[in-house]
Amino acid sequence: MWSKSISSVLWQTPSRRSNSLKNISLRLSNCDKQSAQRKISLEQFRSFSCGNQSLKMRFIQFQRKNDQSTRLGVISNDGSIVTDLSESYPTDMKSFIQSNVSLNDVQQKVNSGTKLQLSDVKLLAPINNPEKIICIGLNYKGHCEEQNKTPPTEPMFFTKFASCIVGPSDDIIAHKITDQIDWEVELAVVIGKEAKHVARESAMDYVFGYCVAQDISARDWQKVKNGGQFTIGKGMDTFCPLGPAIVHKCLVADPHNLTIKCSVDGVSKQSGSTSELIFRIDDMISRLSQSITLKPGDVLLTGTPAGVGMHRSPPEFLRVGNVVESEIQNLGKITNKVVADN
């Protein structure tokens, strides 16, 4: 159509030709605008688009005082104000992620939602019922070096259970069957939409957000007992503290350039950067999705830097009364106390 219009203009007088070309240019410009509008509309419809960088989306699950029901909300960047979104959306995080709401819609609800002081709520784990928690071992160069191991050429995946999850200030149980409980601060990735046979180039499109995690481990059960299988050593109740919020990916410019650290009773134990990851997040998602369908709300733990207790000289393990602080740049801090197994 456009080639015919332009061709006919060439045979017009100079003045008419100028006006006709202006009209064609205007029509092309309008088409470009309409196309852009359609593209924007489509992106807003897609799973939690990053169209507005000013949106402060730190998603939480919480309880109000004197109310044991789980509620959905967002917390301010400084951690002082909670906005309750429970009247507008599902009250559990997995269902909310599955609902595929646009961030612009969420922002409108945040603007009008009930505001609460942090002191008036209890933060829960930001997600407590993922279908899967998939972890990776030996994924930091320093963690390989402290074990005198060559960095792997293939990822070593294993799993934890939803029953491992506790909140950002909940206790870690020192189970009676182990005396070798160890710390492992990790970056957790929360999946935003179903991922199956995903190419590495598009894998980050399937991420919803990030949070701080602790892959608490019973080393005796991980390494010696249970035939050397990880299931019990990694899967005991309370062995996966998460929090304090799921920070939407729009607020994380580069998840592979975040400082990550852990302390016990105020003493630094781990200090590293996610830039040390051997298998990056996109690689993990792509590899897993070739055989395991990742679902909205699934949690991927990306490994831990050097400094775990088992590989210290002499080895160090957590004891009742210890307080473990785990922190990642821009994502926040979780603080968990070790308590006796009653």
What is the predicted role of each segment?
Residues W2-K4, W11-R16, R27, C31, ...:
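N-terminal non-catalytic cap/leader segment that marks the start of a structured domain
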Residues F48, L123-A125, E145-N148, I172-I181, ...:
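A generic local secondary-structure boundary/capping motif
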Residues G51, Q107, T114-L116, K122, ...:
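Catalytic-pocket segment enriched in acidic/His residues
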Residues E131-I134, E154-M156, D170-I172, D179-L187, ...:
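Generic beta-strand structural signal
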Residues P151-P168, I181-W183, R319-N330:
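Structural signature of FAD isoalloxazine-binding scaffolds in flavoprotein oxidoreductases
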Residues M156-A174, A195-K196, T238-V247, P305-G309:
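Short catalytic-site patches enriched in acidic/histidine residues
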Residues E184, I191-K193, V198-A213, R219:
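RNA pseudouridine synthases
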